[in-house]
């Protein structure tokens, strides 16, 4: 789980770890890339990161680096933006799914993961 919003990471980590999944949270993509040796099955990745006074990689840059390391890892991209052209761009890049950060985030992530792995969480 990679998101610079502590509310989102806490919500997702609590929900899915309570179901028995091992989940780690990172604030920024660079931290996630550094942990790729752990061979995750899935990465939930924010589309936009902000860090005052520092240059950080955006979600697409992180995705590209992740895929250089492991082409088989599944990636769900999160965003507060609900734009059709963004969804198409992400699909062309090879993102496995796209979930909007809204009031249905947990349910939508659950559905996405279920579809990707073929099981209920």
Question: Model-found features: residue ranges?
Answer:
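Alpha-helical interaction/dimerization surfaces of two-component signaling modules
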Residues: 14-19, 89
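Conserved acidic segment of CheY-like receiver
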Residues: 1-7, 12-16, 42-43
């Amino acid at each position: 789980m990679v998101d610079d919003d502590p509310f989102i990471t806490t919500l997702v980590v609590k929900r899915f770890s309570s179901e028995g999944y091992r989940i780690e949270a990172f604030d920024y993509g660079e931290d996630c890339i550094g942990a790729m040796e752990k061979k995750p099955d899935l990465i939930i990745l924010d589309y936009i990161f902000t860090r005052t006074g520092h240059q950080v990689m955006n979600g697409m840059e992180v995705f590209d680096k992740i895929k250089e390391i492991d082409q088989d890892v599944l990636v769900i991209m999160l965003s507060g933006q609900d734009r059709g052209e963004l969804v198409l761009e992400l699909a062309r890049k090879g993102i496995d799914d796209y979930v909007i950060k809204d009031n249905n985030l947990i349910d939508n992530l659950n559905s996405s993961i279920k579809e990707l792995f073929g099981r209920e969480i």
